[in-house]
Amino acid sequence: MAVNPLSRREVMKFGAFTTVGGVLTPGISLAQAIATDTRGILARDIELSVGDTKIPAYDARPERQGRYPVVVAISGFTGLTEQHKDVVRRFAQAGYYAIAPELFYREGLMFGKAQPELAKISASIGRKQYLGDVRAAADFAKSQAWARPDRLGVTGFCGGGALTLHFSAESPDVTAAVPWYGHVKRTYIDAPGVDAFAVASRIKAPVLGLYGDADQGIPSADVKAFEAELKKTNPSVEFVLYPEAPHAFFSDDRPQVYRKAAAEDAWKRCLAFFDRYLKA
């Protein structure tokens, strides 16, 4: 009973989805979304091998020859949407080799699903599977000729933010981590009781946390408590709480939650943080 997956109520509290009649419809508000083209970068849809399974992924890197730090960008519970692919391209434009795995391929993807089903699917996936998919993306990226395998950044949004913390705890090769509004008390069906607090002492990489002070699903007190917990064993920790910013404030394809000023400041901080630790 210690499992704390997202319930339907929590999904709706997060306000992280564009919906019509309660059905997830990524892209309905793309007219307002940021569009990053592929000038100067190479972007593609790929497949990753995870054990005996293949899952889709998306990667992008600068077009010019060179070796680039790796950034694994973990999506939220909407999966590998067009907006998330755009974020991957933004990292490439900033001089990184970025990759994002589709975490919900085995479950039939999230597009067109109603919120109760979305919550059920995300809760049914174990920590081991989630982290295995992220590991596959990181290993694939690090093996490419244009990658700097000794510079691995990880970042993620919503559920991907929580996975950013868990992956960093289990992966000593992570150089820097940037969780965006990741639930610090989220646990998994195969790991009851194992939330971010439980693994905080194992996170050795520098961490920049980007959270909204008006997030109805993640109390500011929890964020501050987790920051304090991390700082007990990690000297390179910084958390930012944006006033009046709700959950998913970076989602420019969702005008009901997007907060331009907070999103732009957080993006600048994210890039500066990765530049400091990954481009050194």
Q: Where are these predicted regions, by residue range?
A:
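N-terminal secretory signal peptides and thylakoid transit peptides that target proteins
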Residues: 1-19
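N-terminal cap/lid segment of alpha/beta-hydrolase-fold proteins
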Residues: 33-63
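Short beta-strand element of the alpha/beta-hydrolase
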Residues: 68-75
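Cap/lid segment of the alpha/beta-hydrolase catalytic domain
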Residues: 104-128, 251-253
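Alpha/beta-hydrolase active-site loop
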Residues: 120-143
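Primarily recognizes the serine-hydrolase "nucleophile elbow" in alpha/beta-hydrolase
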Residues: 136-198
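Short beta-strand/loop motif that positions the catalytic acidic residue
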Residues: 203, 209-211
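C-terminal catalytic histidine-bearing segment of alpha/beta-hydrolase fold enzymes
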Residues: 234-280
